[in-house]
Amino acid sequence: DVYKRQIWGLSQDVQVSPFIIDAHSGVLGVGAIEAGEFTAVIGTSTCHLMLDSRQVPISSITGSVKNAIIPGLYAYEAGQPAVGDLFEYSKNQAPKHIVDQANEHHMPVLNYLEELASHIKIEEQHVVVLDWLNGNRSILSNSHLTGSIFGLTLQTPYEMIHRAYIEATAFGTKLIMKQFEDNHIPVHTVYASGGIPQKSKLLVEIYANVLNKRVVVIDSSNASALGAAMLGANVGNAYSTLKEAALSMKQPIAYIQEPEIQKVQAYKPLYHKYCELHDLLGRQYPELSYLI
């Protein structure tokens, strides 16, 4: 109390909640606090989080901590170290003719690339990317791995490569989700938050079809800030429990993307190729990827 008064000029009646990690706060912000709800906080990188009443040993994820988000529940976390950063890299590598066309259409280059990529049918996609341009966090836990592009020909348009970057992040998420489901932590719904899902309908559509899960996009770009506000509301006795605060204060749904059966099936061969390359260069011969 003396510290609050002397340093911050606050009265002793002011209540301050404990701190929380930003991605963990985002779980509260989207209201994904029930078992089977998988939160993907998609920004420059992605954090994948789940809550469960049980602690189950799951290899190749970051770990699990009791009470980290909701009292009494275990918070499980995994992640990908380059997602939005990967798309920014792709934008910066775009050839001049695409940049010029984007300018002619008065569109940001990234938006124009996504528009072009959205017209590529899954069956036409012949490029597969290993999205390790910043190493691999989950499920290989190897920061020395580097990215690779497979399937290039002289006819490959650049927007196909950009689409492959997006698909690779979805494939990586599917591998992470498989780790949970193989260890009896089922997933029925994906909550997509962070700075990217509201901006990229193509990404959300690709994720829904690759993961074969419903993807819920929340109408808030500040889920982590909202989660922090929930902590404040709880400690200030506006709500009796943090769970009550989360259910009462969560933002409305912007839209829900359901998987489309034909597209789910069409992605299976590409995902299989990704997994084969993932294991070849990530597990069997990782030294081939140690180029830096």
Question: For each of these PLM feature ranges, what is it?
Answer:
Residues 4-191, 195-292:
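Active-site core segments that coordinate phosphate-bearing ligands/cofactors
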